[in-house]
Each structure stands twice: as structure tokens, then as C-alpha cells.
Amino acid sequence: MKKLPSKLEKRLQRRKEEDSFRILLSFPEGVDLFSNDYLGYSRSKEIAENTVRILKQYDITNGSTGSRLLSGNHPVFKEAENQLASFHNTQSALIFNSGYDANIGFFSAVPQKNDIILYDEYAHASIRDGLKMSLARNYKFQHNDLQDLEEKLKRFKADSSDSEIYIVTESVFSMDGDSPDLIQLLEIAEKYAALAVIDEAHATGVIGDHGKGMVQKLQLESKIFARIHTFGKAMGCHGAAILGSRNLKDYLINFSRSFIYTTALSPHSVATISSAYRFLEKDSAHLKKLKENIQFFKTEIQNNGLQDIFIESDSAIQACVISGNTKVKNAAAEIQKSGFNVKPILSPTVPSGSERLRFCIHTYNSSHEISQVLKVLGNFVANNI
């Protein structure tokens, strides 16, 4: 076997020296406070059983057998996409293999040469990778800073009157758990005739009536150019969809390379998406319990005097900033020794100095578990920070 080139060896060595070397670990035992399975749908027997019933309606193979433009466009896709469009109150939905594929597929294909993309500086890596593949010019604005966004819009609107301008943000940010003021953002977008693209990955299933997302909670559907909803988090399955006009769907089918040049999701994966949405549509208990647990977690933050190191968030993502890769890894190790699965988020995933513990709250976390993990954290902070 050939050796890894020396340049790559050096990059790996740098990661080790910076204490940011990543490894794959087995799924650990203990209380889950680190997965994105906010509603517990990944373990739902009802969703699994209904998936089998959906598959039995069709003569379906184990795999999709090809891309959707060839042999992979099974009838279950049409059913699921119609269901998604109806649930999310939009003209059309197009399923992609993952949220990553959806974002690189959208941003590499839709914005054109000389167009402008203004994106929140904390936008997900999949958005940033899509921007790298785009012919459009892209510029970041300060996190959730709408004044900075408007200043950039003024400048680029004056300099590029014939170009489309896209504003890109997330409804719930994956690392901080916070949200932008979407109402004001869309007022600004309308003022400058800009097109808004909202990634709803961490709002899907969690925010709004029946988890329809932040955009629908605020009744802003008609003001959005495109929404990206993903299914690997609260929905407990896999895949993603881009929501928008019928013409946008047609355009993506014709020009989005991550859609065109890949084997389609398996019919089982698509049936699971459909099954999870059927369950979500009638489910209120799981979302109610999740909201209660989030509020209890926030109350316990206050009770343990930890509010100064937590980022304010009403979402299922609660981030505790402990600066430094080594220190935050030590904090995570201490918590894990007590039987709680909480993962450190290291730089360069987040900027140096903003390393954090990322707590993910679920319907199945008990009040006792929440109280105990924050006591363990409080003891670590008292003795080490």
C-alpha cells in the first residue's frame, strides 16, 4: 500500500498538535444529549412499521437502481414530494440525498455569474462549500446582524443593478442554536429586491405548528425564494428537500449536478421520510414534551449559575462556550465519565476561542438527567474555569 503524501501527513500532524484531530468512535452508552434525534423519531416503531406498509404498495427493489433521471425515479418519490409540498405550503419539493447535497446542488447551480450572494458568517459548511462551487460572487455578513446586511445590500445594489442578490441564512443555527429575525430580514430583502434562501435543517420538526419550521410559524412562505428542509435530524431518517416554485424545481432537475449525477435515495429511505411526515402531522405530544424539556434545561442553567457561558437559545441546541480545544475536551470527558453523552465542538469547526459543549435536548431526556448533567458541568466549571 502506498504511503500518504508527506504534505498530507503534515496536515494530520498539525491537527494532532492543535488537539483537533478527529477520530470515529463507537456509539457510546449513556444518556443521549448529543444526537440530532430531537423527537426520538429514529427509534419510532410506528414510523418503521408504516414505512413497510408504504413500500408494500409498490413493486420496489432494495436499491433505487440509478439516478432519478434514469431508472431511480420510483413512484414513492412523487408521493413524498407532493406530501412535502402540501405540508410545507409551497408549490413544489425536490428530494436530495442529504442536506449537504441539497445545499451544494442549489448554490452551485442557481446563482449565476455576476450575481451576489450575501450569507451569514455562521452558515453551515454545506452552504459554504456550495458557494465555493458557484460562479456568483459571495460575501458574508456578521452573524444575525441585519444592519451589516443592509449596508452590504445598499452597496451591491448600487454597483450591480442588473444582478440578482441572494440572502442566505439559517432559521436555527446548528452550532449556537439561535435564530435571525426573519421578519425584519425579509422586509430588508423585499426593499432591495433580493431573494431569500433559508436553511431550515434544525427547525424541521421542532419549530412551529407540527414542526413545520420557522418560516411557516411566521407565515412567511410567500416571501421566500427557497427553503431547505432536512430529514436527518428531528425527522429521524435521511435526505433533504428544496422547496420553492415549480420553475425552481424544473431548473434544479436540469442543472443541479448533485441531483443529476448521483444514484437516487433508496425507496426505503424515501418511504421513511413519508412515514415520518405522516406521524408528525398527527403528533403533538412529542413536540410538547421537547418544548418542556428545553424550558427545563434553560431553567436549570439559571439554577446552576451557568447562564454566562451558555449562548441564549430557545431551540433544542444549547451551546456552552468553554474556550480552547483541550479545555472543552476535558469538560466533555468529565461529563461522559458521569454517564452523559455530550460532545465538544472544536476549532476549526467553530472559530478559535468559541469552542463549546453542544447539548442537544430530546423528548426522551428526563428532568433528572437534565438536572444531573448540569450539576456535573457546574462542578467542572467551578474547579477549572
Language model segments and positions:
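PLP-dependent aminotransferase class I/II
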Residues: 234-301, 308-310
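Conserved PLP-binding active-site segment of the aspartate aminotransferase-like
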Residues: 34-40, 278, 316-325, 341-374
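Conserved PLP-anchoring active-site segment centered on the Schiff-base-forming lysine
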Residues: 106-125, 150
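Conserved N-terminal alpha-helix of the aminotransferase class I/II PLP-enzyme fold
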Residues: 49, 53-98
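Active-site PLP attachment segment
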Residues: 210, 216-251
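Conserved PLP-binding catalytic core of the aspartate aminotransferase-like
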Residues: 41, 289-295, 306-338, 361-363
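Active-site phosphate-binding strand-loop segment of PLP-dependent enzymes
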Residues: 139, 143-198
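PLP-dependent enzyme catalytic core of the Aspartate aminotransferase-like
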Residues: 45, 49-53, 86, 337-338, ...
